Amino acid sequence: MKYIAKKCGVRFQPPAMILIYENEAEGKSRQRIMPVRNFSKFSDCTRAAEQLKNNPRHKSYLEQVSLKQLEKLFVFLRGSLQGQSLAETMEQIQRETTIDPEEDLNKLDDKELAKRKSIMDELFEKNQKRKDDPSFVYDVEVEFPQDEQLQSCSWDTASVDEF
């Protein structure tokens, strides 16, 4: 049987993931409540999302729901268990999923660095122009304005004297 996922959400009390789906054979919309057991404010959201998605009981229903979306819903659930408001949890997710250009990536631990790199890879893939894109241009020439004065740096002039 084929199920088409329409909406996916989270219920905080008692903790559960809720999926609104359409049964392809009947064409009826239905709601599936998947209880979340053994999840605390210290739980790993990635692991919990993988376990729910790979659970044989829910697997066929969650085929069209991305792992990232389930992870995000588990982060909301964990934030609720930690006593955070929805706004605080959304702000935390926003901080974790965006890259600050001024952030020093050398100071991050391996796990955080891997997370930042995966975010950068996703952004690159999303923004990358491919040959089959309608707005793709093979040889782009860009002219830079020559009116502005070139700024020199102190180390530029120092290195010229050494040679």
From Swiss-Prot:
Q: Which superkingdom, per the lineage? A: Eukaryota
Q: What is its main location?
A: cytoplasm
- Keywords in alphabetical order: Cell projection, Cilium, Cilium biogenesis/degradation, Cytoplasm, Cytoskeleton
Q: Name one GO biological process term.
A: cilium assembly
Which InterPro entries does the entry link to? Answer: CEP19 (IPR029412)
Signal sequence: where? none
- Output a single Gene Ontology CC term carried by this record: cytoplasm
Q: Which Pfam families match?
A: CEP19 (PF14933)
Q: Where in the cell is it found?
A: Cytoplasm, Cytoskeleton, Microtubule organizing center, Centrosome, Centriole; Cytoplasm, Cytoskeleton, Spindle pole; Cytoplasm, Cytoskeleton, Cilium basal body
Subunit (UniProt):
Interacts with CEP43; this interaction is required for its localization to the mother centriole. Interacts (via residues 121-150) with RABL2B. Interacts (via C-terminus) with CEP350; this interaction is required for its localization to the mother centriole.
PANTHER family xrefs: CENTROSOMAL PROTEIN OF 19 KDA (PTHR31539:SF1), CENTROSOMAL PROTEIN OF 19K CEP19 (PTHR31539)
Family according to the record? Belongs to the CEP19 family.
Which purpose does this protein serve, as stated in its record? Required for ciliation. Recruits the RABL2B GTPase to the ciliary base to initiate ciliation. After specifically capturing the activated GTP-bound RABL2B, the CEP19-RABL2B complex binds intraflagellar transport (IFT) complex B from the large pool pre-docked at the base of the cilium and thus triggers its entry into the cilia. Involved in the early steps in cilia formation by recruiting the ciliary vesicles (CVs) to the distal end of the mother centriole where they fuse to initiate cilium assembly. Involved in microtubule (MT) anchoring at centrosomes.
Protein name according to UniProt = Centrosomal protein of 19 kDa
Recorded source organism is: Rattus norvegicus
- The protein's gene is named Cep19
